[in-house]
Amino acid sequence: MLHPPSLAIGAILASITIIVVIFAMNGSLYEQELLIESAPKVEQMGPAKITMDTFVLNGSPILGDPNAPITLVEFGDYQCHYCNVFFQSIEKEIIKNYVETGKVKIIFKDYNIIGPDSINASHGAHCANEQELFWEYHDILYSKWTGENNGWASPTNLTMFAESIDADMDKWTECMNAKKYSKIIMDSNN
């Protein structure tokens, strides 16, 4: 049997709850309308114009004929698994069939998103680029890749990679120690 005072208290609480919910909903709808009406109008802008200068003025390395009619921009992180898959399975064919035939040039842009090893590897590649060995260093970095954030781009390994492509080690080491390309590397993500 139901206790009459309990039923009355329950009915009152239920009624109060329903009234509070209705007022809350009406109030929030009213506030949403106010927010929508008071939002400032923003002039729509198109996308920023991207030109070849966007890619080459910061010293991004170019592979192939600079006057090739097609430009392929490789955005890469030397620790990136999918970047490595691209290098291992597709890039060599693109180079063979399109870059070496003068149809395409490739521009490399650092896109370091994974970790400190990415930045260290990019420094190594830019320092190798001073000796016109960027693409050789790029290739060895991807060939020796062992995973993300596991230390494969340690100073010792990066030095061994530079030695293996016959870089002038005094110049390369001086460049690395000076972190000469830090700004270019960090700005590449913008």
Where are these regions (language model features)?
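Extracytoplasmic thiol/disulfide redox context detector
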Residues: 1-113, 183-190
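Cysteine-centric redox/oxidoreductase cores and disulfide-bonded domains
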Residues: 3-18, 23-39, 111-190
